[in-house]
Design a protein with these regions (language model features):
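AlphaC helix of the eukaryotic protein kinase fold
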Residues: 57-73
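Activation-segment/catalytic-loop signature of the eukaryotic protein kinase fold
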Residues: 85
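Conserved short submotifs of the Hanks-type protein kinase catalytic core
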Residues: 89-103, 107
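Conserved activation segment of eukaryotic-like protein kinases, specifically the C-terminal portion
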Residues: 179-201
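Protein kinase catalytic-loop region centered on the HRD/HxD motif
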Residues: 129-142
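C-terminal lobe helix-coil module of Hanks-type protein kinase domains
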Residues: 196-284
Length: 284
């Protein structure tokens, strides 16, 4: 099919051109959120730079703008950079750094045996580092709010990337360090997340950095045991400790995971850096 400018069909064919700049190469994925394409930037002829483009319904334009604003100041290896966003007819588009690899859910489904402890810990350490960066950002501390296997990509070099900031939320600097009455209204928000991975307080519309720690613990539990929390009773991790499902996991790692998924916020790790230190101390 010949390339056409300003193409806005539901699924764009290879060769279609968006915004007089981006040449669609192929579809990377589709879901309720929309479509993700691999594309080439026409303006950068010599480098033949490729990008990922998320196509979403027009009602998502506010989310596109919000994500772009939130991520514009982020600079971390695990966070894909934002390059552009725009709207055309019935759709909004978010252009970001292309990450080629597999998400953790796809990796897990492809495994006939349990993933190794060393592999899961390696991923978790990288995720902790990214969460620590987000939670302590100097301009707008951020809670990811939707950490789960399908939102974590591992590239061909083994580097972890957080790939969907659709539910991420930013807060004023210092917001989590001390109670500030003038920010009290910011604690309350919509109860959003993914059942099985989100902690109890998130269903009540309240989140803290420890909410992401719970989601990481839930993700690790799933990766180590193959027990999908979406198919189980909510908040039931204590009924199924890691080693009861996978005896090859060390007691030390089991303790870290179970601490992360404590129902009480205060029972979890105080912050992502503390959890990262515990993981690094396993000496695998």
């Amino acid at each position: 099919m010949p390339a056409t400018d300003e193409s806005t069909g539901e699924t764009l064919p290879p060769g279609a051109i968006l915004n007089k700049r981006y040449v669609i190469l192929k579809v990377l994925g589709e879901g309720s959120f929309g479509v993700v394409y691999q594309a080439r930037d026409k303006r950068l002829v010599r480098s033949r730079k490729q990008v990922a483009i998320k196509q979403m319904p027009m009602q998502s334009i506010v989310d596109c703008e919000r994500q772009s604003d939130l991520r514009a100041t982020l600079n971390h290896p695990a966070i894909p950079r934002i390059f552009d966003y725009f709207a055309l007819e019935d759709y909004s588009y978010l252009v970001e750094e292309l990450v080629l690899g597999q998400d953790l859910e796809a990796i897990l489904k492809a495994q006939s045996d349990f993933l190794s402890e060393e592999t899961v810990v390696g991923w978790a350490i990288q995720i902790c580092d990214a969460l620590d960066y987000l939670h302590n950002h100097p301009y707008h501390p951020m809670i990811f709010r939707d950490l789960k296997p399908s939102n974590v990509m591992v590239d061909d070099d083994g580097v972890v990337h957080l790939i969907d900031f659709g539910l991420a939320r930013a807060y004023p600097p210092g917001f989590f360090q001390e109670a500030q009455p003038e920010f009290e209204h910011l604690w309350k928000g919509l109860a959003m997340g993914t059942e099985g991975y989100s902690p109890p307080e998130q269903y009540q519309g309240y989140v803290r950095p420890q909410s992401d720690i719970y989601a990481l613990g839930a993700t690790m539990h799933h990766l180590l045991t193959k027990r999908d929390p979406r198919n189980e009773l909510p908040f039931s991790f204590k009924r199924c400790p890691v080693r009861s499902l996978n005896p090859d996991v060390s007691k030390g790692l089991e303790a870290i995971v179970m601490k992360a998924v404590d129902l009480d916020v205060e029972g979890r790790f105080a912050n992502a850096r503390e959890m990262q230190t515990a993981l690094e101390g396993l000496h695998l």
